[in-house]
């Protein structure tokens, strides 16, 4: 059990409560004074900072306002399409905002700092008066409580005495008469005891009444103390301090809002005017003031004194006409070749821009350098192409058949670009070099070729050739499901590469995008309209046959080496990007095809040795997955021969159309009967497996032949689905097939 609470005297308890009240009121007063002081000092320091900042801004803006900018005239100061007036307006607006901040510093001093000091001084004086008055009121209440305690004490004493007399009287009344007491003595004692009891009861009643009256008075006094006197003291102590604090807080917020409003009004106006600044108007002003940038007069022909001619001249059947035709052929070829260079460099530029963010600063710098080189190559090619087109335009004005040469050259370039789409695209190698960044070398080689091509006299040849030059890209019009092992299943809208004609009519051999080869119906395909220059090569049959013999022998060696040495070749596909940590490790992107050279090593640390993009190194085997036999190109029906160490990735570029009209020439064709042609290089053979252009190398592609065990179809091709099956069933013929 806990001991009963200790009884404290009422007067002592009252003094403790009143002392605590006095302490709390003084603490409240001190907190309010501290708040006033904080507001006062904060406003002073903020005003000083604002003033210093505003003066610094004014000094900064004034320095720039002293400069004389070009293009600012007195009558053009409100023309905000020029950047110089807007800039000057911005500086002037900054000066105005800085001046408004200085004015705000005065508001801090006038509305917060000085009034807060006066309010605090007044509050200190009010505290002293309130403390004296509260002490007096508390003393009066203490006296009242003391009287209450005295009345209570007197009441307890008289009541206890009366209680004792009453008990004694009751005892006497109940006691029996003894043998030695007389009745008279007993009566006297009883009368005396009753008189004393009556007197004690009267005193007790009087003391009780006094105590109750004093208690009522003390309670009334206490109620007034808490309800009136103490409230008045606290009200007097507070005074108007809360009104002043509210005014100061409002002044802080209003001042900031006025500052923000002034800044917003100024810079909103400047923002609207800044949006009117346009480059074209500023450039126009600059050009008006600087006549040196005006386009000069075109260069004029300055004839010799004895020369009376002012333009190109052509005489029918003369050497000059032949020379002009050769010039037209030369520059048409140059236009086509530069168009091809632009396409190549644009492809390289797109690949470089999609390369992603380089990890190191050095790699980033190298990547930016490659991008700049590609853009520079495009710029040079465009200039050369423009100059060649200007020459062709002048030749066309005198009747030279420019369009014929340009159309033939562009068709040849379009064929080459279309065939190159199936080759390995240009890519960045491990050492940062680019396979296709050789436009300058190609251009130099082309110029040397143009200088030497005058030895061929082919001005009477014709560009009207309709023979197909395989390999050729085509589009599937109707789906077809293979019914024989040597046929190929195709889907509608699929893009195929036709390799060669079939032995039977209406059949061709084609390769799909995954490398599968087989025979498909020719009428199920849509071939591009090609105006190639195959007929031009007929005049170079001797040179072509020599080049063809050399190229065939080289390809035979490559095929033999592939069959004998790469029978167990294995490829894997990268599942993630990997950056080599050392010089002997191989780096590759996600989806890369890597040729495996060795899976076993002495450490057995999970690293394989492989080749990617011409570089050999080791890499973690957990980052790749092995390709199946069909993916490796080793299906039993096709026996594809893989010469490149990695399969050609699928390019997302759309098929390039073959031009029926020159894409960049605005000239209409004058007369196609008088067309003349430009011969291809003797190294380009119409039956070659490679589609190469001067200075541009692409991956080699081998065409499967019947010598490797493929059976050519000896059956009629099915008609397209849109045609009626009007053909009758043809009799199967026995054909003797000889495997070589």
UniProtKB/Swiss-Prot annotation:
Start-end of Polar residues biased regions: 629-645, 675-706
Sequence ranges of Basic and acidic residues compositional bias: 307-323
Keywords: Cell junction, Cell membrane, Cell projection, Coated pit, Coiled coil, Cytoplasm, Endocytosis, Lipid-binding, Membrane, Phosphoprotein, Protein transport, Repeat, SH3 domain, Transport
SH3 domain location: 469-530, 567-629
Residue ranges of the TM segments: none
Primary site of residence: cytoplasm
Gene Ontology MF terms: phosphatidylinositol-3,4,5-trisphosphate binding; phosphatidylinositol-3,4-bisphosphate binding
An example Gene Ontology biological process: positive regulation of Arp2/3 complex-mediated actin nucleation
Coiled-coil portions: 356-397
Ranges for domain F-BAR: 8-282
Membrane topology, from the record: Peripheral membrane protein
Tissue expr: Detected in inner ear vestibula and in stereocilia in cochlear hair cell bundles (at protein level). Ubiquitous. Detected in testis, liver, brain cortex, cerebellum, kidney, organ of Corti, utricle, spiral ganglion, tongue and eye.
Description of post-translational modifications: Phosphorylated. Phosphorylation on a Ser residue is important for recruitment to the cell membrane and for its role in promoting endocytosis.
Annotated domain remarks: The F-BAR domain has an atypical, flat shape and binds preferentially to flat membranes. Upon heterologous expression, the isolated F-BAR domain is localized at the cell membrane, and causes the formation of cellular protrusions. Recruited to clathrin-coated pits via SH3 domain 2.
Function of the protein: Adapter protein that plays a role in endocytosis via clathrin-coated pits. Contributes to the internalization of cell surface receptors, such as integrin ITGB1 and transferrin receptor. Promotes endocytosis of EGFR in cancer cells, and thereby contributes to the down-regulation of EGFR signaling. Recruited to clathrin-coated pits during a mid-to-late stage of assembly, where it is required for normal progress from U-shaped intermediate stage pits to terminal, omega-shaped pits. Binds to membranes enriched in phosphatidylinositol 3,4-bisphosphate or phosphatidylinositol 3,4,5-trisphosphate.
Protein name, UniProt field: F-BAR and double SH3 domains protein 2
Source species of the chain: Mus musculus
Lineage, top ranks: Eukaryota, Metazoa, Chordata, Craniata, Vertebrata
